């Protein structure tokens, strides 16, 4: 019987050669993207076991894995069920497996367990750079990467206009859904360009003062608002002046009732998604949304504001702040801030275009006017 005999040196050389060839094979099939933090993220195959750092990040997957945005998700946080129950109920009816989808946390970064994530054996973790889930500053991300699990950071929250493109492109590449990602981004940028072109013609003194109150009725005190990032940056992008940014140093903060009354804003917008605040989102009717906004504007603290007195208050679905669908918020806010410049902009028609890309469309009242 013929036996192949190799010296220890030749055996080591052969093993090194095999390892090198295996590395070349992996590299040949590897996918690499740059995330919103400028990090290079590489996977050696299209991920099939995804963990979402926040449940509401699934909105991006809905545009990519259109038939079933949960087909690759093996774990997520419980934030959508807790913080946007209307949307959760709509998707749970379409995808009953959501009730059994493993939870990695509830609705905070502190509640997320790295051990629970590792037990799910994911091949990709998708985290946001701010919010209710693990961020780049979280030890969870470090632990996963040390365990060999790629972590992709996306962002629709901090710099929504700038980072929606980067986030969707990266997801489209890693998931093998480049065509779907580009289809949505083409729509997004076409609609955004109309806003940008008109805002660019405005003079510096043509920026109405806007007070955006986040989750009034749900938040423990009146005056919770945004600084220069997030929806605050959207106010500036549509040609408004965010009065919150003048005094809130960070992303979010509370302003006093006295400050708001003295600032005398021209536009009042309240965000909401659940009781006892402004009811907006999936399955919510116009009548319900308008009645809930009326309760919020009747609060004695801000009832004296000019836009509220004039019946020109507005309500906006809160979850636009962390969603690729933020183009709808951009268009709605543009019409509220500069109605004379954006008469022909129709966010309802834009939502119809987006719904053509979704198996479960956006069906409900996502913005509302006081009258």
Placement of each model-derived feature along the sequence:
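Alpha-helical, coiled-coil/dimerization segments enriched in small aliphatic residues
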Residues: 223-250
């Amino acid at each position: 019987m013929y036996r192949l005999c190799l010296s220890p040196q030749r055996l080591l050389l052969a093993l090194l050669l095999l390892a090198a060839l295996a590395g070349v094979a992996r590299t040949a099939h590897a996918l690499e993207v740059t995330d919103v933090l400028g990090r290079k993220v590489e996977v050696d195959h299209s991920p099939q076991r995804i963990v979402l750092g926040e449940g509401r990040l699934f909105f991006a997957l809905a545009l990519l894995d259109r038939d079933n945005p949960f087909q690759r998700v093996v774990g997520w946080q419980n934030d959508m069920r807790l913080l946007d129950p209307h949307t959760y109920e709509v998707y749970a009816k379409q995808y009953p497996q959501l009730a059994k989808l493993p939870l990695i946390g509830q609705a905070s970064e502190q509640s997320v367990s790295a051990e629970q994530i590792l037990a799910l054996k994911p091949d990709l973790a998708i985290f946001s750079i701010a919010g209710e889930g693990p961020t780049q500053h979280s030890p969870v991300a470090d632990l996963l990467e040390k365990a060999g699990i790629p972590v992709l950071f996306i962002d629709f929250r901090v710099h929504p206009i700038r980072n929606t493109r980067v986030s969707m492109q990266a997801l489209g590449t890693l998931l093998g859904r480049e065509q779907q990602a580009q289809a949505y981004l083409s729509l997004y940028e076409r609609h955004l360009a109309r806003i940008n072109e008109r805002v660019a013609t405005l003079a510096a003194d043509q920026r109405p003062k806007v007070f955006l109150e986040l989750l009034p009725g749900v938040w423990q005190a009146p005056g919770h608002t945004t600084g220069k990032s997030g929806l605050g940056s959207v106010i500036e992008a549509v040609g408004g002046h965010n009065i919150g940014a003048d005094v809130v140093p960070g992303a979010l903060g509370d302003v006093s009732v006295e400050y708001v009354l003295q600032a005398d804003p021209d536009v009042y917008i309240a965000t909401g998604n659940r009781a006892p605040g402004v009811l907006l989102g999936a399955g919510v009717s116009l009548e319900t949304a308008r009645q809930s906004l009326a309760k919020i504007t009747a609060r004695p603290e801000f009832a004296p504001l000019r836009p509220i007195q004039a019946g020109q208050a507005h309500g906006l679905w809160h979850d636009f702040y962390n969603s690729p669908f933020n183009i709808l918020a951009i268009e709605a806010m543009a019409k509220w801030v500069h109605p004379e410049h954006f008469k022909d902009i129709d966010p309802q028609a834009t939502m119809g275009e987006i719904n053509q890309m979704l198996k479960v469309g956006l069906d409900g009242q996502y913005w509302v006017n006081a009258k």
